[in-house]
A protein has these predicted regions:
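SAM-dependent transferase fold signal centered on methyltransferase-like domains
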Residues: 1-346
Length: 346
């Protein structure tokens, strides 16, 4: 048995700090749930009375492992301590990770440890890189909690739920802040125009750039397209009826929806700027419109990129151009955001 200080649940952190400062807190022992109170383990140095609070004898509990590698056997972990994967993606009930060559023989042990560690995980997948025309993840299922093999799952981003399938359609959770900023720019554009706006995303994927706009009062219509039919299937699940969804070549979309869009989203990082000339026909005339896009460029080509965009849009149509570095892509390249406010004559 071990002595535990019984404290009000709401004051637990305060008492942990109090005990820690006095070196009275027992190491490597878990705090216990006592209903509306918590039992904080005391070491042998702690006195028999502390601020008039009850001290109770409880069977000590080991703290829950903090990382899935803590659930591997000590001998196995120590033998390959430099090689266990330290990063993974948790997408809904999927865990996706790359397995270093040195520990490939222990995929089952890795998967079992992850399933034990994370109760919400249904499937553990090895990431073998990207494949195919649409550059989707090549996933190999290592283990499934319930025997299912589907990699379709649901994620939540800024209060919106999205159906995704990383084995069939590209999705990255790492641009959530960019998507929120895009939404705010859409709100601002609607205010400047004093009316509802039409938003077009020719490279919509499963719809992460559009989900925040879906169902909002200031949005008249969403036009969404993607060349990947599997992405379009999920896109239809993620957007409401107030949208036109198709599986079309982005460069042909202006023929289908000429001069319809107020806000155009262009997220095809390796080709975004080269595709701009064929996308301009989507934008409305006689009022302000906006392009918000992302591209990967050489870090030394910032001024050249700015000049290229201006040559495509034409100076007489340009209200404002902002180019902002977002993150490094490689030692030579970076991801940028370009935001273009335009006024085309009618």
């Amino acid at each position: 048995m071990m002595r535990h200080l019984s404290v009000p649940r709401t004051d637990t952190s305060l008492w942990i700090e109090f005990l820690s400062k006095r070196d009275w807190l027992a190491a490597s022992v878990a705090i216990q749930n006592l209903g509306d109170r918590r039992g904080i383990p005391l070491n042998q140095s702690a006195p028999n009375t502390i601020e008039g609070l009850p001290i109770v004898d409880l069977e000590p509990k080991l703290p829950e492992p903090k990382h899935w590698t803590d659930r591997l056997s000590v001998e196995l972990f120590d033998q390959y301590s430099d090689f266990w994967p330290t990063a993974n993606d948790q997408l809904g009930d999927l865990v996706i990770l790359k397995i270093p060559e040195e520990v490939k023989d222990f995929k089952q042990e890795i998967a079992d440890a992850i399933l034990t560690h994370s109760e919400r995980t249904r499937i553990v997948c090895e990431d073998k890189g990207v494949k195919g025309e649409f550059r989707v993840r090549d996933l190999r299922i290592m283990a499934s909690r319930d025997g299912t093999k589907s990699t379709r799952t649901q994620v939540k981003e800024h209060s919106k739920k999205l159906w995704i399938d990383p084995a069939k359609a590209y999705y990255s959770p790492r641009l959530g802040t960019e998507r929120l900023n895009t939404f705010e720019e859409g709100v601002n554009l609607a205010k400047r125009l004093s009316r509802k706006i039409v938003i077009c995303d020719p490279y919509a994927g499963v719809g992460p750039n559009l989900s925040l706009f879906d169902g909002e009062d200031f949005v008249k219509l969403i036009i969404a397209s993607d060349l990947n039919p599997d992405a379009v299937e999920l896109l239809k699940l993620n957007l409401s009826g107030n949208s036109l969804i198709s599986c079309d070549d982005a460069k042909e979309l202006a023929k289908i929806h000429p001069e319809k869009a107020d806000l155009l989203l262009v997220n095809l990082p390796h080709d975004s700027i080269d595709h701009l000339p064929s996308l301009l026909g989507l934008l409305g005339r006689g009022h302000e419109v906006m392009i918000r896009g992302w591209a990967i460029i050489n870090k030394d080509m910032f001024l050249e990129t700015e000049a290229k965009i201006k040559s495509i849009i034409k100076e007489e149509n340009l209200i404002k151009l902002d180019i902002t570095p977002i993150k490094s892509y490689s030692p030579q390249d970076e991801v940028i955001r370009f935001q273009i406010r335009i006024l085309f004559a009618e």
